[in-house]
Amino acid sequence: PKRGRKNRLTHLVYALDVSGSITSYQAQQFLRSAKTLKEKLNPKLMTVMLWDTRIQFEKVFREDETLDNIKVNAGGGTNLQPVYNRVRQINPEALVIFTDLCVDIPPKPTWETIWFVPDPNMYKDQYMNQYLQAVTYGDVYVVPEK
């Protein structure tokens, strides 16, 4: 059997933006990235949330489960506050957010936050750099388009 790492994550929350500004391609790309993240980090628990103005889907996956049968339907507005409210209840070690940042960023939380955003060079929104500057906490990573 595989041995766990000493500093292994016990609970990671992965929040995928499925609002109307997210393209179908981006949503699928974000989901593929979630699968890769789970394989690499292998937390004991990984809560996956799909959200727009509310949490549309939430499921906890154990370390021996794969992220399968998650259907993504993008549409609607964008509000991160319901995600932050729920994450506050869960109290994980980290929150990973995949979003295009077309959202008001809540105040800095107590948990570690990691942002994954589309490549601004490929993104059609002229305000993308402004959105990136709105993120004042956590680490921001760019997801290449291809």
Please provide the spans of the model-predicted regions.
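Acidic, polar low-complexity linker/tail segments
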Residues: 1-13, 22-25
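Residues at the starts of beta-strands that form the adenosine-phosphate
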Residues: 11, 45-47, 94, 112
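Structural beta-sheet core signal
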Residues: 14, 48-50, 97, 115
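Residues that scaffold, gate, or flank divalent-cation-dependent active/transport sites
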Residues: 17
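Catalytic P-loop NTPase motifs of RecA-like helicase/translocase cores
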Residues: 21-23, 104-105
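An active-site-proximal "capping" alpha-helix that borders the catalytic cofactor pocket
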Residues: 28-50
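VWA/integrin I-like adhesion module and closely mimicked acidic/polar interface patches used
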Residues: 29, 102-146
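Von Willebrand factor
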Residues: 47, 55-60, 64-104, 120-130
